[in-house]
């Protein structure tokens, strides 16, 4: 059996309450002086108080770490950033952990540091499931991002692109953990170091100092903490400076106010960018993102394939993201879980193979019997199911409107883009409207984030093999006597949402290569029949109390590999200022938050929310390379 699940760290606890790794025979931190040691070795060793205090307004600082463990180093860096870093700056902390701590062990560790309690609480709220790969956690109102890779350190650094301003070399001692402290580690650290990057580690082992020195670090010994005689500090001085290109002026224009556009605008705005959003219609999210309810779910493949990895990563980030930003007085996010029914023999066999061949954490996905699924849903169901506890439903247009209310975002409605023109300076001139109302807007960074805008796109976008997909959802106005007390989202051939007041939303039809957005009675009836296939017990009630049906049709776009297009539209530096986010298909609620993060990371040079090998599979130019 394979699949993405990792084993939790096997711990025991010393008499004074310090966690000990049974696999490595070493402690995670000293119960008496853990924060003090972190402050001395990593914060002072990298001169972070001085550097944070002197950082200019709006600046970005990236810290990379080996050995996340209990998160102590991250929490201490976060606390220091909030104390003396620029209020409008952004701290990006990236780390790796091969054996993640179980949540209950994390809680026990954090109880030792009451001074970090509020930061620790926020970390635990977004702490990821033990699944291999990259996990993104955003603490938006803190100006802090955590990008945590669960897996092997060499695998991580061989498949990501960033330049750190400071390195924390932590983890268990080299004697107990020689696999991590291998010779292959040091060139990877150097390749992920900005000019002037500092490094600090508790160890003064000769091979560590030599490895760092051989790959561009000026290293020296420093007095160690407590009983340790020495530690190592250093500064990176590459023979050929490998600094990333300077950040652009932090202003951008986004075309489109649906899920893709709103998420891109929000990701940039929360990093201090000024964003203008152009929307052709007179309202936000006028197309598919305007549906009255939408489900957050994915359908993972039997194999741990590229598509499954991307969708799983996006789903897990979306779950954390919505839980953080959509906690409003009138909730727009309901994390009620999703049941994917084995609605026919083919799907039943597929689900059986899935669970036979894969290990997933129960908190991500697990099998439910027919009886278990019915008890959870609150209605009688016809089949067993896959259960996604982190799924749920949202109100997409309200979600888009909420994100676009950020003070760094200006939304211009009734602003149809008619043409794009390259300027002599390498930017873009946007032509808006026509006749007397025509306007022009110039920008250096432009992101196209609509499903159907080929008419105004450059030739490179028109060359994308996008196909339209028509979908119609149906809202049923149901008498209270017939309204099911549905507790969770149901998926099969279609989906059914838990009711809002006296309304049920179900859908959606799926018609590839059809761009007709007219509502049809036939599609409403098809959606009703799909609903009754999901919940046959409703047939009698709805026949006694016939519902009123109201449809809403829209057109999405997709690509042949059913992955989105995210990133520079024109490869190379010449196309750096023009990006596209499109082809979300029917998974916009799962994919769009990750897409927004990825675009922001591409523009700022920060660690991406997925591995580089996966980034390559969503770049728009992947079809021109085939």
Swiss-Prot record:
GO-annotated biological processes: methylation; tRNA wobble uridine modification
Main function: Catalyzes the last two steps in the biosynthesis of 5-methylaminomethyl-2-thiouridine (mnm(5)s(2)U) at the wobble position (U34) in tRNA. Catalyzes the FAD-dependent demodification of cmnm(5)s(2)U34 to nm(5)s(2)U34, followed by the transfer of a methyl group from S-adenosyl-L-methionine to nm(5)s(2)U34, to form mnm(5)s(2)U34.
InterPro entries (alphabetical): FAD-dep_OxRdtase (IPR006076), FAD/NAD-bd_sf (IPR036188), MnmC-like_methylTransf (IPR008471), SAM-dependent_MTases_sf (IPR029063), tRNA_MAMT_biosynth_bifunc_MnmC (IPR023032), tRNA_MNMC2 (IPR047785), tRNA_S-uridine_synth_MnmC_C (IPR017610)
Gene that encodes it: mnmC
Record bears the keyword Lipid metabolism: no
Gene Ontology molecular functions: flavin adenine dinucleotide binding; oxidoreductase activity, acting on the CH-NH group of donors; tRNA (5-methylaminomethyl-2-thiouridylate)(34)-methyltransferase activity
Top-level taxon: Bacteria
EC number(s) stated in the UniProt entry for this protein: 2.1.1.61, 1.5.-.-
Cofactor names: FAD
Chain residue ranges for the region called tRNA (mnm(5)s(2)U34)-methyltransferase: 1-237
Pfam families for the chain: DAO, Methyltransf_30
Similarity annotation: In the N-terminal section; belongs to the methyltransferase superfamily. tRNA (mnm(5)s(2)U34)-methyltransferase family.
Cellular compartment(s): Cytoplasm
This protein's GO CC annotations: cytoplasm
Ranges for region FAD-dependent cmnm(5)s(2)U34 oxidoreductase: 255-626
Keyword DNA-binding: no
UniProt name for this protein: tRNA 5-methylaminomethyl-2-thiouridine biosynthesis bifunctional protein MnmC
HAMAP family xref list: MnmC
Catalytic reaction list: 5-aminomethyl-2-thiouridine(34) in tRNA + S-adenosyl-L-methionine = 5-methylaminomethyl-2-thiouridine(34) in tRNA + S-adenosyl-L-homocysteine + H(+)
Keywords recorded for this protein, A-Z: Cytoplasm, FAD, Flavoprotein, Methyltransferase, Multifunctional enzyme, Oxidoreductase, S-adenosyl-L-methionine, Transferase, tRNA processing
């Amino acid at each position: 059996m394979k699949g993405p699940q990792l084993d939790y760290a096997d711990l025991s606890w010393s008499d004074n309450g310090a966690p000990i790794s049974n696999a490595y025979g070493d402690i995670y931190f000293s119960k008496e002086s853990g924060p003090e040691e972190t402050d001395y070795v990593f914060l002072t060793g990298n001169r972070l108080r001085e550097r944070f205090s002197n950082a200019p307004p709006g600046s970005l600082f990236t810290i990379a770490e080996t050995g996340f463990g209990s998160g102590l180093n991250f929490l201490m860096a976060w606390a220091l950033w909030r104390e003396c870093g620029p209020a409008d700056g952004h701290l990006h902390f990236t780390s790796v952990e091969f054996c993640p701590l179980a949540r209950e062990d994390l809680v026990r560790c954090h109880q030792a540091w009451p001074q970090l309690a509020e930061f620790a609480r926020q970390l635990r709220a977004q702490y990821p499931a033990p699944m291999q790969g990259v996990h993104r956690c955003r603490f938006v109102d803190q100006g802090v991002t955590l990008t945590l890779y669960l897996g092997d350190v060499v695998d991580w650094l061989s498949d990501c692109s960033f330049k750190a301003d400071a390195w924390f070399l932590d983890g268990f001692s080299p004697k107990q953990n020689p696999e991590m402290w291998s010779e292959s580690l040091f060139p990877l650290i150097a390749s992920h170091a900005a000019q002037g990057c500092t490094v600090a580690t508790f160890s003064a082992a000769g091979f560590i100092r030599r490895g760092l020195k051989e790959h561009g670090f000026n290293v020296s010994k420093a007095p160690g903490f407590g009983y340790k005689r020495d530690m190592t500090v250093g500064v990176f001085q590459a023979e050929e400076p490998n600094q990333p290109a300077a950040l652009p002026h932090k202003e951008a224009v986004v075309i489109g106010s649906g899920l893709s556009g709103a998420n891109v605008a929000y990701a940039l705005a929360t990093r201090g960018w000024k964003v203008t959003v152009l929307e052709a219609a007179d309202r936000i999210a006028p197309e598919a993102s305007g549906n009255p309810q939408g489900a957050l779910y994915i359908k993972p493949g039997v194999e741990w394939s590229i598509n499954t990895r991307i969708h799983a990563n996006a789903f897990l980030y979306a779950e954390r993201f919505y839980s953080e930003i959509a906690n409003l007085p009138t909730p727009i996010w309901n994390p009620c879980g999703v049941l994917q029914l084995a609605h026919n023999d083919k799907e039943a066999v597929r689900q059986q193979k899935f669970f036979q061949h894969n290990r997933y954490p129960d908190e991500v996905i697990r099998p439910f019997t027919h009886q278990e699924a019915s008890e959870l849903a609150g209605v009688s169901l016809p089949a067993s199911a896959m259960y996604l506890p982190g799924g749920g439903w949202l109100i997409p247009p309200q979600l888009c409107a909420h994100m676009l209310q950020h003070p760094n975002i200006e939304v211009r409605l009734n602003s149809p883009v008619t043409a794009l023109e390259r300027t002599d300076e390498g930017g873009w001139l946007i032509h808006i409207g026509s006749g007397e109302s025509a306007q022009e807007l110039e920008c250096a960074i432009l992101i196209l984030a609509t499903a159907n805008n080929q008419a105004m796109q450059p030739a490179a976008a028109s060359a994308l093999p996008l196909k339209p997909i028509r979908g119609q959802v149906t809202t049923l106005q149901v008498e209270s006597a017939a309204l099911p007390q549905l507790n969770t989202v149901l998926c099969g051939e279609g989906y059914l949402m838990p009711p809002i007041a006296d309304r049920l939303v179900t859908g959606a039809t799926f018609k590839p290569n059809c761009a007709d957005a007219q509502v049809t009675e036939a599609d409403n009836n098809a959606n009703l029949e799909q609903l009754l296939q999901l919940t046959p017990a409703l047939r009698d009630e709805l026949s006694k109390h016939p519902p009123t049906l109201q449809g809403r049709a829209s057109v999405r776009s997709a690509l042949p590999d059913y992955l989105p297009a995210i990133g520079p539209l024109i490869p190379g530096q010449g196309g750096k200022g023009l990006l596209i986010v499109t082809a979300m298909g029917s998974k916009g609620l799962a994919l769009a938050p990750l897409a927004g993060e990825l675009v922001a990371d591409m523009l700022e040079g920060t660690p991406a929310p997925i591995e580089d090998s996966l980034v390559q599979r969503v770049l728009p130019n992947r079809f021109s390379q085939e």
